[in-house]
UniProtKB/Swiss-Prot annotation:
The keyword Transferase applies. The chain crosses the membrane at residues 1-21, 50-70, 76-96, 112-132, 140-160, 176-196, 200-220, 225-245, 250-270, 300-320. Its main location: membrane. One of its GO terms (molecular function) is metal ion binding. InterPro entries: Glycosyl_transferase_4, PNAcMuramoyl-5peptid_Trfase, PNAcMuramoyl-5peptid_Trfase_CS. It is found in: Cell membrane. It comes from Staphylococcus aureus (strain bovine RF122 / ET3-1). This is Phospho-N-acetylmuramoyl-pentapeptide-transferase. HAMAP family: MraY (MF_00038). One of its GO terms (cellular component) is plasma membrane. GO terms for biological process: cell division; cell wall organization; peptidoglycan biosynthetic process; regulation of cell shape. CDD domains: GT_MraY. It catalyses: UDP-N-acetyl-alpha-D-muramoyl-L-alanyl-gamma-D-glutamyl-L-lysyl-D-alanyl-D-alanine + di-trans,octa-cis-undecaprenyl phosphate = Mur2Ac(oyl-L-Ala-gamma-D-Glu-L-Lys-D-Ala-D-Ala)-di-trans,octa-cis-undecaprenyl diphosphate + UMP.
Length: 321
């Protein structure tokens, strides 16, 4: 059945994207490009966004099919809730952006409050209503040591889900970058899940992986469609949730290393400018810095994918030991 889920997720996305693109163009749901960004990006103005709707719909449909046949499908139900929750926040943000024809959307406060709400509901559904059971301790790799957090684990979950949701969002600035890194990440978590005996989570990772594979051909340079916040916020939230449900939170640092680096580059840039009036990078997130020093967009993407693959394998090794 795993092959069926994979094929279904792949086909649905691959078929939906070319159907959605003309609809988005007709509705003028095109991406606005930052004027201060690399000049090479200006030609992307008007490229349809909100393409994440295609793979999210594929994930929802395929997951509902899987829930019927998979024993102990509660993990899939919970992951589906997170997918829809974070995806809905991204959809609202995208909708406001394309209607107003600017790069604003939801305010930071509105977005954070909504993300925090989804994270808290996730914790309540899992640990209060016991849809799934996972430890409220952080396990240290290669040891039998676990750091109990008790109630503070709620804060940790919120930090991880909200932080990683926005990390993937920041990374989604080059054609295919976030999509490719997510494919690598879900591949690692799929293998990890099956090795750890978490079959339902593994199946969901397979669904994620193949839904994104169906989207990638339309998203690589030159992109015919962008996933938008609809896709990126959902992907980040799912990554964090999977690491939490596997009790392998620290593996996320490596499996999502490029996302972490991208986020840190923004934080360092802002802090440096506020404290010294000088910028560390030519532009942040850091993928734009490499563009501005002369790298082609495709070179940045492939190098970042390679880094993601190597760090992902390290994260996988950590997770299964």
């Amino acid at each position: 059945m795993i092959f069926v889920y994979a094929l279904l997720a792949l086909v649905i996305t691959f078929v939906l994207v070319p159907v959605l693109i003309p609809t988005l163009k007709r509705m003028k749901f095109g991406q606005s490009i930052r004027e201060e960004g690399p000049q090479s990006h200006m030609k992307k103005t008007g490229t349809p966004t909100m393409g994440g709707l295609t793979f999210l719909l594929s994930i929802v449909i395929t997951s509902l099919v899987a829930i019927i046949f998979v024993e102990q499908a509660n993990p899939i139900i919970l992951l589906l809730f997170v997918t829809i929750g974070f995806g809905l926040i991204g959809f609202i943000d995208d909708y406001i952006i394309v209607v107003k024809k600017n790069n604003q959307g939801l305010t930071s406060k509105q977005k954070f409050l909504a993300q925090i709400g989804i994270a808290i509901i996730f914790f309540v559904l899992s640990n209060v209503f016991h849809l799934v059971n996972f430890s409220t301790s952080i396990h240290i790799p290669f040891t039998n040591v676990a750091i109990p957090l008790s109630f503070a684990y709620v804060i940790f979950i919120v930090f991880l889900q909200v932080g990683f949701s926005n990390a993937v969002n920041l990374t989604d600035g080059l054609d295919g970058l976030a999509t490719g890194l997510s494919i690598i990440g879900f591949t690692m978590y799929a293998i990890m899940s099956f090795v750890l005996g978490e079959t339902a989570i593994g199946i969901f990772c397979i669904i994620m992986l193949f839904a994104l594979l169906g989207f990638l051909p339309y998203n690589i340079n030159p992109a015919k469609v962008f996933m938008g916040d609809t896709g990126s916020l959902a992907l980040g939230g799912i990554f964090a949730t999977i690491s939490i449900m596997l009790n392998q939170e620290l593996s996320l640092i490596f499996i999502g290393l490029v996302f972490v680096i991208e986020t840190l580059s923004v934080m360092l840039q802002v802090a440096s400018f506020k404290l010294t009036g000088k910028r560390i990078f030519k532009m942040s997130p850091i993928h734009h810095h490499f563009e501005l020093i002369g790298w082609s967009e495709w070179k940045v993407v492939t190098v970042f994918w390679a880094v993601g693959l190597i760090s992902g394998l390290i994260g996988l090794w950590i997770g299964v030991h």
